[in-house]
Amino acid sequence: MNTPSNRRKFLAATSAAIAATSLPGQALGRKDKQEIIDLHQHTNYSGRNDERLLRHQKAMGIKWTVLLPAGRKFGLGAICGGNKTVRRVVVKNPKNYVHFANEIADHPECIETIETYLKKGAVGIGEQKFRVDCDSKHIERIAELAQEYNVPVLMHFEHGNYNTGIERFNKVLEKFPKVNFIGHAQTWWGNIDKNHKQEVMYPKGKVTPSGISDRLLSDYPNMFGDMSAGSGQNALIRDEAHAVDFIKRHQDKLIYGSDCNDLIGRGPSC
């Protein structure tokens, strides 16, 4: 997809959360009442079991949830389930969930593992949250696989830790124009501000437009934003006047996600 499109077309055409071939038409909003898709959740997140996750999502009014696996044990930097776990939950609840595939980016079996689960029905790759540069050969190999299977890649950008070097990510977008990338996490959302200090994870105060993320969303049709977690929320509430303009400017590029690990699906912890 080389031209900007609305959120619904993005989901249908690129599987950027849900592949059109994987879900019935109503999941793409073809009913009178549009259904909510949550791009970003995890299984066994901080010990939350499958039943509680399902209740959590229903409490939030979510119809379809994208489950993001950790890859092999100790991957992702979060306590959550891996590829086998998300696959099992999707098979058990095919009317509530779809899943991505994932693996540690620089692991020798990364591509083989991800491809195994793409063949099983994964509709994307991620959440890529591993200690590599965002323009490394490892990410390029993942992008090549994503291009082959026509699926998106969800990237967790965190300065000093994961997918480092966001200022160079434009090179990846240019090299793989047919692959849709979804930006997420502290460094992605901090960089909506032109004056962002990279070491600050949750910046406060007024935002000056034209930060790195802002420009990537504007300049590259294959760059999208995942609004989930405290980082997405912080990007909006730190400067509400800017948030209004930002959403208007990028409304066809922003995707809802929760990424919360609470048990009830409402209140300040969610």
Residue spans for each PLM region:
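An N-terminally biased module of ancient metal coordination in phosphate/nucleic-acid-related enzymes
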Residues: 10-11, 28-85
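Active-site gating/metal-coordination segments in enzymes
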Residues: 72-73, 79-164, 224, 229
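Catalytic pocket-lining loop regions of alpha/beta-barrel enzymes
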Residues: 123-124, 136-256, 263-267
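Active-site neighborhood of phospho(di)ester-bond hydrolases with catalytic His/Asp-centered motifs
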Residues: 37-39, 66-69, 100-102, 126, ...
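Structural motif corresponding to alpha-helix initiation and N-cap regions
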Residues: 4, 47-51, 80-83, 107-111, ...
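Beta-strand-enriched cores of mature, soluble protein domains
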Residues: 46, 258-261
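N-terminal secretory signal peptides and thylakoid transit peptides that target proteins
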Residues: 1-18
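N-terminal signal peptide c-region/cleavage motif recognized by signal peptidases
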Residues: 22-24
